[in-house]
Design a protein with these regions (language model features):
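An N-terminal hydrophobic leader/cap segment in hydrolases
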Residues: 1-23, 28-35
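Conserved alpha/beta-hydrolase
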Residues: 53, 60-86
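Acidic catalytic loop of the alpha/beta-hydrolase fold
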Residues: 256-260
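Alpha/beta-hydrolase active-site loop
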Residues: 91-111
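Catalytic active-site module of serine/aspartate enzymes centered on a nucleophile-bearing elbow/loop
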Residues: 276, 281-310
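Alpha/beta-hydrolase-fold enzymes
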Residues: 126, 131-216
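Short beta-strand/loop motif that positions the catalytic acidic residue
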Residues: 245, 251-253
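Short alpha-helix in the alpha/beta-hydrolase fold that links the catalytic acid
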Residues: 247, 261-270
């Protein structure tokens, strides 16, 4: 195993956190970070777009306190994993199913580290899209938690055909690397005042995210490329056409969600035979980084779900 940088001072997580470089089957270098000591099992934590291992340091403390070790990942194209374009600010992936190669590398790493089983999945936002695909492909977890999963993206109905057409056209005329309309190269938390943000109502957690990127700007990522947008739209459509997997899953959704499409989540969970949807009154997109009361509820109900399905 090759050690990778791990920024413990900004993660603010449990003692002993560490990171390693992983090589995917297509030769890319991604990063995985872990916090060990929980003996009930291990959480495979799939972050959202723009995110990185250290963002979940405080969440790891909560999970470790409740008995679970945590393994998180910098997906290809973000964090300090290999970026996919010369323009490091643009979020990009060649093909959305490529993220499953990262999943395979993370799973092999969990086994190489000897992390305690059973495994459970947490998928936040884009990680919820990747995680749902991984469940269909046989990810060996006993249960899952989805946090505001990206099973749809909020796009005004009048603009939805334009999003499909512009993203499809851009990639076919060699312009797929350009940022999607309405996005910018500066990462969201660095360009948006707290009072205008759509991530959390908790100022302390917003400042925590901002401080991480101020200290380590190499972790930052701007808006998605048009190519990424087209790939994401196609993947979400493919997933929506499939029945829910058998893996038991609890899903958390804030009542103020303004990034992913709530109707897609309601539709999925209404027809999920081993699923439960928990609505969080007043919460925005980042339910694990919300107010203390909301965070505590999420961590308690998540680990109770894992306990019941181990």
């Amino acid at each position: 195993m090759t050690p990778a940088p791990f920024y413990a001072e900004v993660a603010d997580g449990p003692e002993g956190g560490a990171a390693h470089w992983l090589t995917t089957s297509d030769g890319l270098r991604i990063r995985a970070g872990h916090w060990t000591g929980g003996t009930k099992g291990t959480i495979l934590l799939f972050p959202g777009r723009t995110e990185y291992v250290e963002k979940y340091g405080r969440a790891a403390t909560e999970f470790l306190t409740r008995g679970y070790s945590v393994l998180a990942v910098d997906w290809r194209g973000q964090g300090i994993a290999d970026r996919m374009l010369n323009d490091r600010a643009a979020g990009h992936v060649h093909h959305f199913p490529d993220y499953q190669k990262d999943v395979s590398a993370v799973l092999a790493h969990a086994r190489a580290l000897g992390l305690p089983e059973p495994y459970h999945l947490i998928g936040h936002s884009m990680g919820g899209c990747i995680g749902l695909r991984a469940l269909y492909e046989g990810l060996p977890v006993k249960s899952a938690m989805f946090s505001a999963p990206m099973w749809g993206i909020i796009i005004a109905p009048a603009l939805r055909p334009f999003a499909w057409m512009s993203s499809w056209t851009a990639r076919r005329v060699g312009q797929g690397h350009r940022l999607a309309p309405g996005t910018e190269p500066v990462t969201y938390v660095m360009s948006t005042p707290f009072d205008d943000n759509t991530l959390t109502t908790d100022r302390a957690m917003f400042d925590y995210m901002k401080a991480q990127l101020s200290a380590h700007p190499e972790l930052a990522l701007g808006g998605p490329s048009l190519h990424w947008l087209n790939e994401a739209l196609m993947e979400m459509r493919r997933l929506a056409a499939r029945p829910s997997p058998a893996t038991p899953a609890i899903t958390f959704l804030g009542s103020n969600e303004r990034i992913v499409e709530p109707s897609r989540i309601h539709d999925r969970m209404a027809d999920y035979p081993n699923g439960k949807l928990v609505m969080l009154d007043g919460a925005e997109h980042e339910v694990m980084m919300e107010t203390p009361a909301i965070r505590t509820r999420v961590f308690n109900e998540t680990t109770a779900w894992f306990d019941a399905h181990s």
